[in-house]
Amino acid sequence: MTGERTRRPAGTPIYLEPLYWWDIPVLVGLEETLFPGDSPWSAEMFWSELAAGHHYVVHRDTTGLIDGYAGLMVVADEAEVQTVGVRPDGQGVGLGRAMLRHLMTVAGDRRVLLEVRTDNVNALALYASEGFVTLGIRRRYYRPSGADAYTMAYPQ
């Protein structure tokens, strides 16, 4: 399936829907594609997130296939972006931004935290453009690659 066949037409509204258990195998496959070498999330991790009641959404392309997903954990007065992922052929059209904004709406007035690889230039640009600031660095955060992560927050 090519990106042209599945890409959302410009100006088309982005509709998000809840993540259901039957979506988990697709997300595991996307994790393996998007985060190779960095311990992509397993089915068990997604099951655990759903069982804990954390907020997860998916987006489907024009053919009905999941091309994006995002999750948020809310605890007391803070929220943490657990993951944001967009299939490679769906990147660059605002889907990641729409999902991040949705998570921030769910977070409400809470401080929102996240971790992001220091070499993930596109994600860093997205987070900065949405008002996130870098708080610090976590050395060798991602395993097994040993890649570093920035800790970011909104508002700081």
At which residue positions do the language-model features occur?
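Conserved acyl-CoA
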Residues: A98-V112, L126-G131
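Acetyl-CoA-dependent GNAT
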Residues: G3-R5, P9, I14-Q91, R97-V106, ...
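Conserved functional loop/turn residues at catalytic and ligand-binding sites
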Residues: T83-G85, D89-G90, G94, N120, ...
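C-terminal "cap" of GNAT-fold acetyltransferases
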Residues: R5, G11, Y20, L113, ...
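A generic structural signal for beta-strand entry/edge sites
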Residues: A76-E78, R111, A149
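A secondary-structure capping/hinge motif
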Residues: T134-G136
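Well-formed, non-transmembrane alpha-helical positions, independent of function
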Residues: V26, A125-L126
